[in-house]
Amino acid sequence: MNNFFQYQDDKEYKYKILVYPNITYMKDLEKDSYVVVLRNVIKELNKVRDDIHWTILSPKHVMSLQFENTEQLMIDMPSYPNKMRTHFNADEILKVIDWRNSDYDVVYSHLPEQTLALKNLFHNSTNISPKIIGYSHWFEVKENSNYESTMLAQNLLGVLEMDECGVNSIWLKEFIIKKSKELFSDKQVKQLEEIIQPHYLGIDDVSPNHKYEPKTILFNHRDNDYTGYGWFVEQMDELYKTRQDFKVFTTLTNLDRPYAERVKLSSRKEYLNFVRKMHMGVGCFKTYSAWSISTTDGLSQGVPYVLPNKLCYPEMVGKDYPLLYNEKDFLTTIESMLDNPNAREEANTYLAPLLPDFKWSGRVLSWFDNWKQLDDLKVIQDTDGYQRILKFINRRKSVTKKEILEHLGWGVRVGWSSYRNRLRTEPTIKLTKNRYEVINK
């Protein structure tokens, strides 16, 4: 299924990016963190430039990834827990990307575990040599996974094939570099230190100062071990023994307790409208945490979160944030919030000057060296072969990649990307989604 929008073949797209997905929430892709990140990357880049076309590999069509400059190509892909990290169907991918007819200048991989295979597939089975960049949403380590075997080594091998790989925080970068020392040489660890860079995730907008329901506590995370869900329930059970004037709301799991209620919300708008009514949110992450989008969702709506004073959270909200806790002080902090209205106001007053910098618009555009990675693509010298391509385009005025290759008699063994990169620099040639055209003056 391709994009709903009808393409105009004469629209100039200097760069074509192929996105390799990371699917962990198949039952509702709109809520998958990968989709949330990619949607905001495309949206923010579209505000400042119109020369990128995105081809997104996906197991299902995702409405929120539907833009004028995107297309979605369907591939079979398993999902969580980690089958998607082990699955790679080279024949299907080759068929779908249609390399004889299509161009890809950059591969934006959101699944590092498959990036080494993906790079080899391009370099050895097509005539395309794209730049590889990426984002790692998750690293399988003992601190967050109870699998007998994990894919951490495979993940890092994929990262080593990238020019740059984003992670959600400096804390996570340092955590993974420490883990990598158990697996790789000093030279490879140094490479990882250069490749892995913090790409802070964002919020849609800042909308504080809403009326809230007093003494409500929001747990809007998954019920996994790494989120501290079991420990949180134990703490709430203890609190309920001494007071029954609070209520816990969950959004992703059912909690069978007299003090708890699950809410099921059908859209992001409905979700945020609910979140902003909460007195407080909580984060109970123990030994590992991604940059919690569920936490920043709440902060953006004026809901302060009680957060662990470790992992990425001092980096997220600052070391002086008044609701950072050590485990022994968790219930004391919760009760202070329940009983002292000023505690909520103090936390929001602290956050107010920080939140504008949380917006996606201020974060995405700084990634990949302000996206200058797109400008650093290998260009062929002015060869006889290049001149033949240039003359063919000028004579025909508008041609496809396949027509050029057939004219030259070139197949998979003649690299194409460096020729395309030189064509991009020609003042009289423009690159469109599927064609190379002479600019009419």
Language-model features: where?
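N-terminal subdomain of nucleotide-sugar transferases
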Residues: M1-M63, D237-K241
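Conserved catalytic-core segment of nucleotide-activated headgroup transferases in glycan assembly
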Residues: E30, V37, D204-V206, E213-R257
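A charged, aromatic-enriched C-terminal amphipathic alpha-helix characteristic of glycosyltransferases
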Residues: S33-V36, P341-Q381
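Active-site proximal beta-strand in glycosyltransferases
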Residues: V106-Y108, L121-S145, V159, E164-G166
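Short His-centered aromatic/hydrophobic patch
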Residues: S109-T115
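A short, active-site helix/loop in glycosyltransferases that binds the activated sugar's phosphate group
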Residues: A153, G158-E193
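Nucleotide-sugar-dependent
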Residues: G283-T295, N309, P314-E315
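Short hydrophobic beta-strand element within catalytic cores of glycosyltransferases
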Residues: P304-L307
